[in-house]
Structure formats: C-alpha cells, structure tokens
Amino acid sequence: MMKHEFYYTSRDSVTKIHAIEWLPDREIKGVLQICHGMVEYIDRYDEFAEFMSEHGYYVVGHDHLGHGKSIQTEADLGYFDERKGNQYVIGDIYQLQEMTRKKYPDVPYFMLGHSMGSFLLRQYLTMYAEGLAGVVIMGTGHQGMLTLCAGRMICRVIAAFKGWKYRSTFVDSLSFGGFNKKFEPGETSKEWITSDKKKRDEYVRDPLCSYTFTLGAYYQMFTGMKVLVRKGSMKRIPKTLPVLFTAGSDDPVGAFGKNVTKVYEKYKDAGIKDVSIHLYEGDRHEILNEVDRQNVYRDILTWIGERNKTKAES
C-alpha cells in the first residue's frame, strides 16, 4: 500500500485543496472517495483507508475548504465564503471525482460521507449520482426547513454586527450544545464523539479538530442542508443506486438512530431499490473510531464488495 498527498485548486479559484490517495499493492477492485466531517480532516481516516486499500480498493479524499491543510492561513480554519461556500465545497468534491475517474475509468466508483460529509454527499447525489456503484451515508441526521431557516437568519443577524468571519459560541452551542448531555458527567465535553477513550483524547488534543466554525461556514452549511428537505429533492437520484445508511445507536447527530431511520425511510419512499440501514449498538458518532471499528470496517467492505460484484456482472 502506498500513501500519497497532492493538491488541486478549489472551485474558489484561490485555495489549494489538500488531498490524499491510498493505493493498493494489487489490482484495483474499485474506488472509494471519502467526504470527511465538520472540524476534522481526511488524514483522520488513515486506518480505515489502509484497511480498504489492503483489500484492493483505491481510496481518495480531500480536506474540505476551511479544514485541515485546505487553508491559506490558520485564520481560514472553519471559514467558507458566505455567498458561494457550499457551491465551492460541492464543486471540490466533484473535481476530485472527475480527476479520479480519469485515472481509473473502468472500475466501480463508491463514495462515503461522514457527518457533515454525509449531508454534503446527500446533496451531491441530487446532482452527480449518475454512474456511482454505491454510497455509504454515515453519521447523518435530519433538520427541518424551519430550523435551517432560523439558523440562517441568526447567522445573518450576528454577521451584520460582527462580520461573516466571526466565530459565534452562541451559534456553535445551538448546533452542538446538547450532544454530550447523555454522556455527562464527562471529562472533555466530547464524549459523544466516541466511546474509545484513546481516540477521543487524540481528537480533543488535535488543534485541527478544536476550532469554531465561522458564521459564513454555518450559514453555507445550513444553505446546503436546505436542499435536502425541499420537496422532490431526491427525484434526480437514480433508483438503482445502492445506498447504505450506517451510524451508532448512541449518536446524537442522528437523534440516537431516530433521524437516521427517518432519512432511510425517505430514500425508500423515493423508490430507491437497494437501500439498507445498520445501526451499531452502543456506538457514538464516529463509528470508524469506535472500539468495535474493525467490525464496522469489515461490514462496509462486505457491503461494497457485494455491490462491486453486482456491478461487474451487470
């Protein structure tokens, strides 16, 4: 297995997007593109990416704008352009897919999105799902239109006084404030992330996982999420696209499984034929960093392998 870092120009025409590819030592069975979550970065997926690469998959992913190494200065951490940030982030995912397809045009192409990356991937599917062999939607959730509109309005009001690069603890608290409630008393306020103490401590100590989103980033994230709750938003998703929803049963982002199931049911109701759900009992938000993560890895590998075989036979 070989790991290689590279950069490409963001759709914002300014930022250099940092990306990593994990290349297997054997013939490539398929491609897996990963979309990471909020306030983290792609190299945190190294253990899982190595596992998939060892089993013959080319894995690739990038740091979203305002994350990891996809910044110009440290002040850019947690910042999206307040006008077109969501458009740029989606565009960067598409660019990476196009580059990767040119390298490997003849193998099945899978995608995985975690947390914020799951919301981005769900939005992405309403535009660019054609030709995908399957997608894994991990650690997702659901917010209603009124909640998202209220969130955008609050961002606009505060930004009128503080500017779009302001980091509002109030907005941050509205978004994440209640997530740790079930796990109190805790040492870090991040117990909701994973039950694996070692992984959790690494997360808490990591400066690239401990900043606050700017108002511009929150505003654009809420803007993108609005797409998901618009009537008819899933009409453009191919009915034959295999979709796996997966999360921890103790993940507050998905309302402890309730909202993951809700989104899963929406996909079924939209007529998508191969849609399934797997909730891991007792796991929290980052199932790829949980104590039973090897089981999660194997389950994802099996699910992708089954769809890969189907794709090869069709």
Regions found by a protein language model. Give the residues of each.
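Conserved alpha/beta-hydrolase
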Residues: 44-75
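Alpha/beta-hydrolase fold nucleophile elbow
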Residues: 104-115
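Alpha/beta-hydrolase active-site loop
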Residues: 81-101
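Alpha/beta-hydrolase-fold enzymes
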Residues: 123-208
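N-terminal cap/lid segment of alpha/beta-hydrolase-fold proteins
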Residues: 1-26
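Catalytic active-site module of serine/aspartate enzymes centered on a nucleophile-bearing elbow/loop
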Residues: 270-314
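Short beta-strand/loop motif that positions the catalytic acidic residue
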Residues: 245-247
